């Protein structure tokens, strides 16, 4: 498992490489919730997936074979950018975790 650093800003993009896979994440505000776009090696995995707590962002096993992401929050609060790095974090876990 690996924690992915997030900035407490409403819209952000980040790119990380894990186990020879390049992940591009876009996290943005959509009304009163956060949504995520996920690409792996330039291929779309998920678009505008709602960010929830303690549930994988990639809900389908066949799309998550190279790993998955989950928001960890206090008291099961929905992910919100103002809490990133304080009470909320994003973690990646690979197939061997």
Predicted regions and their residues:
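Short, charged/polar N-terminal "headpieces" of proteins
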Residues: 1-26
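Generic structural motif
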Residues: 9, 21, 30, 41, ...
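Acidic, aromatic-enriched beta-alpha/helix-loop junctions
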Residues: 31-73
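Acidic, low-complexity intrinsically disordered segments
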Residues: 55-97
């Amino acid at each position: 498992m690996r924690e992915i650093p997030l900035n407490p800003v409403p819209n952000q993009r980040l790119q990380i490489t894990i186990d020879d896979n390049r992940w591009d994440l876009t996290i943005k505000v959509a009304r009163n919730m956060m949504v995520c776009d996920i690409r792996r090696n330039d291929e779309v995995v998920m678009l505008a997936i709602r960010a929830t707590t303690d549930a994988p962002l990639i809900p389908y096993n066949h799309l998550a074979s190279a790993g998955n992401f989950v928001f960890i929050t206090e008291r099961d609060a929905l992910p919100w950018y103002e809490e990133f790095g304080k009470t909320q974090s994003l973690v990646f876990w690979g197939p061997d975790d």
